[in-house]
């Protein structure tokens, strides 16, 4: 009965679509940006490389409440830095309710999730790129390969296991996005930031529908497993550390 109700409830499908949007946007952007940053800072000397790693990793180790406080101020309709900057540039003439407008709220959540998710992948990619066989890179350079060719033919296959790990972890974290929504929007406005995880929480601990929430949890676990298997099948190249 719970599963029958679940798959006929529009609110669940809205939460599922929001969750899939977060995953589809966050996973490739976090992976690509992390690899790009790691590629840029890996050739640096130890001091600047360590500095940049710390800078990008800082949001990942900062408490969620502290992160939310900072971003809530930045998104504030009247005193926030985003509206101030856009007004100063003449892009807008009226304040935007970033977290109170269904058109923008989900993108604000994705942006915050992105900034808190890139730290660990950057550190992992720096380590992976540092382990790439230098003799292969030097041989490619001697043969006249461009930096782009060297990256795609040598470095990219070498960091594929790290990319697989980053993609799976980012997928799981995106599906489990909850604290940001709980503290920033509570699923609103108009369920525009409702996710499957938050939908599960609401039904379990607000409406006390434990059986229904359990059904939501089972469906969420199956979806995460399917995404993880798909990523493993498409990205696993047999390369080992």
Please annotate each region the language model reported.
Residues 1-241:
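A structural signal for multi-pass alpha-helical bundles of membrane permease subunits
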């Amino acid at each position: 009965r719970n599963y029958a109700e679940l798959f006929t409830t529009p609110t669940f499908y809205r939460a599922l679509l929001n969750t899939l949007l977060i995953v589809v946007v966050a996973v490739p952007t976090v992976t690509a940006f992390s690899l790009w940053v790691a590629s840029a800072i890996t050739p640096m000397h130890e001091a600047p490389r360590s500095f940049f790693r710390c800078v990008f990793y800082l949001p990942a180790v900062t408490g969620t409440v502290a992160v939310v406080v900072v971003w809530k101020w930045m998104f504030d309709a009247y005193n926030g830095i985003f509206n101030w900057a856009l007004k100063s540039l003449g892009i807008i003439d009226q304040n935007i309710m970033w977290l109170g407008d269904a058109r923008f709220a989900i993108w604000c959540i994705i942006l915050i999730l992105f900034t808190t998710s890139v730290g660990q992948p950057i550190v992992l990619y720096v380590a992976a790129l540092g382990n790439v066989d230098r003799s292969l890179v030097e041989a490619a350079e001697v043969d006249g390969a461009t930096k782009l060719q060297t990256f795609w033919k040598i470095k990219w296959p070498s960091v594929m296991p790290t990319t697989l790990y980053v993609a799976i972890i980012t997928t799981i974290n995106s599906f489990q996005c909850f604290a940001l929504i709980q503290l920033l929007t509570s699923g609103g406005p108009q369920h525009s930031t409702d996710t499957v995880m938050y939908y599960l929480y609401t039904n379990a601990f607000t409406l006390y529908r434990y059986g229904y929430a359990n059904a939501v949890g089972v469906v969420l676990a199956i979806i995460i497993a399917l995404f993880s298997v798909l990523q493993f099948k498409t990205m696993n190249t047999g390369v080992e550390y």
